[in-house]
Amino acid sequence: DSDEFLEMSQIPRSLIVVGAGVIGVEYATMFSALDVKVTLIEPRKTFLDFIDRTLIQEFTHQIRENGVDLRLGSAVANIEDKGDHVQLELENGRQVQAEMLLFAAGRIGATEKLGMEAVGLELDHRGRFSVDRKTYQTDVPNIYAAGDVIGHPSLASTSLQQGRVAACHALNT
């Protein structure tokens, strides 16, 4: 996973990154700069949707120019460990292989066992809360949510700030 990925003892010759979110793109560009052959796979047809489309178009051009094989709209159907490499089969039938695989398709908050229906809160299909983005208050007064349980961007720094805003609002400060 992305937390332990940098502890590897040697740099791979090739890398597949599944997930073109902030973390996946960061690792893909970092390893590409180290002359690693990188394939970045994203099941959606777009990526980093919270960034201006014009900037993303230019960024897409630059990372491809730097050697990243960007595969948008490509979902993974199967993963096989072949010993000296990993082989992925995509839903379109194409195969991709590399020495190493990084799964960076995001984190999901552990909300399924919270029993939120008991207080009248519903979660979306990914187990996320709907909140007021100015206060991080849910539809139920006095219940707030921040970080991975509300969706993108799921970054520690962003989550920390969301938590601060929610706490200030909850305490009326």
Regions found by a protein language model. Give the residues of each.
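FAD-site-proximal beta/loop scaffold in flavoenzymes
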Residues: 1-11, 95-169
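Rossmann-like dinucleotide-binding cores of NAD(P)H-dependent redox enzymes
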Residues: 7, 12-16, 22-87, 91-92, ...
